[in-house]
Amino acid sequence: MNAQTARLSRPARRLETIITRQPDLIEAAQKLRYRVFSEEYGSDLGATVPGIDADEFDRYCDHLIVTDQNTGELVATTRVLHHSKAMEAGGFYSEGEFELSSLYRLPGAVAELGRTCVHPDYRNGATISLLWASLAEYLVSRDVDYLIGCASIGMSDGGLKAWRIARYLQREFLAGEEYRVTPLRALPHLTHTVSEERPVDVPALIKAYMRLGARVCGEPCWDPDFRCADLLVVLDVNNLASRYSRHFMRNQAQ
């Protein structure tokens, strides 16, 4: 371990999480991101280097990665952009999709979560729980009060699924007026009514956001690079779901 990398938790089963700014680990995360996002959204992501999902925000972020210690493979990743680093970067990533003035008025430190993905073979409760527990530990250690980020939904069916999920989340998990944002590129509305009676298949990562206590901040945005719909979500870090807070506090005591 070097000065660019800090271990956050003990291995859970065969998995380990670390927070890093180490270039080779960030590149491995960028390769996983490309694989997952290009397959799920059917887009080359506007990549300038084949097989790598990278942007100008990566160098300002802390990157949380999950590694399988049996194989050495990186199996999950997300990145966190703290408010102070966002100012150096010219703003948050999500400011390219939403008008965020309401969130800048929040009383406390804000950080942005982004590029969250999990290897298809590791999309289980253990991996996701470890990812969120490590994230909770990081946020508390950095005195972050609010977490924002984009929750993405694929558009392979032309938008019906995205609108059904968006409407469901707005009904069940809509944030208060003080958290509302406006999309810069609003997702085009369907020409027919979205049924509210049929079951809604919410993506696993978005379910995890809601379990953490996240809330949806308004209407969805269209992301042309990823060919997906994005919803801006906000999480009051003080309201982290109890099972995640207990998890990281237990690790601290060990």
Predicted regions and their residues:
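Short amphipathic alpha-helix that is part of the acyltransferase structural core
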Residues: 6-82
